[in-house]
A protein has these predicted regions:
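Alpha-helical cap/lid subdomain in secreted, periplasmic
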Residues: 33-41, 57-190
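Gly/Ser/Thr-rich helix-start
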Residues: 13, 19, 50-53, 81, ...
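Serine-esterase "nucleophile elbow" of acetyl-processing enzymes
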Residues: 1-51, 63-71
Length: 190
């Protein structure tokens, strides 16, 4: 077996996938490289981001995805923007969120749960701005869930507006900023 220090599964939607990045980059790529370079060890991240998906869709694929990477003891979870955009019931989204977290726990994976920055800035797509109200409710719930389940909360709510390329998706600098936030959470746990 190769000398790999850590493997981290990164699950989410287009924000995890890296949609809109001109070079196909994503926060998971940067996170793996930052961990490897900073600590002089081999870290691997696996990007399971699927554009357009919500918590319920992640639940359908989550268990199988995590089984495909048994060496990934940690999971970066960043989901919920599409739940808010598609105006899904907050209650139902949170049931699906908790079901995903139950799957992670059943497989013995530690979760870093990220909050949602919401929709900001000039040039934002024409999705309803009211989605930010739903995002605020999800973020409040995420904080409570992280506390109750002893997960590591990764707060992305204060993402600088210049890190958005279209009000929702991220610039390359935005992907690096998110990677740095997950990096800090991963290091804080050690």
């Amino acid at each position: 077996k190769s000398n790999v220090y850590g493997v981290i599964a990164c699950q989410g939607d287009s924000l995890t996938f890296g949609s809109r990045d001109p070079d196909g980059m994503s926060y998971p790529i940067y996170l793996g490289r930052m961990l490897s370079q900073k600590h002089g060890q081999t870290w691997a991240t696996v990007n399971f981001g699927v554009p357009g998906e919500c918590w319920a869709e992640l639940w359908r694929r989550n268990y199988h995805e995590l089984l495909s990477v048994p060496e990934a003891g940690e999971v970066c979870l960043w989901m919920g923007t599409n739940d808010a955009w598609k105006d899904r019931s907050i209650e139902q989204s949170l049931i699906a969120c908790e079901a995903v977290l139950d799957q992670c726990r059943a497989l013995g994976r530690f979760v870093y749960l990220a909050t949602l920055p919401g929709k900001r800035g000039f040039g934002a797509p024409r999705e309803p701005w009211k989605m930010n109200e739903a995002i605020e409710k999800l973020n409040v719930a995420y904080k409570k869930i992280a506390e109750e389940r002893r997960l590591q909360l990764v707060d992305l709510t204060d993402m600088p507006v210049e890190h958005f390329c279209d009000g929702i998706h991220l610039t390359q600098a935005g992907n690096k900023w998110v990677a740095e936030k997950f990096l800090a959470a991963i290091e804080a746990r050690r």
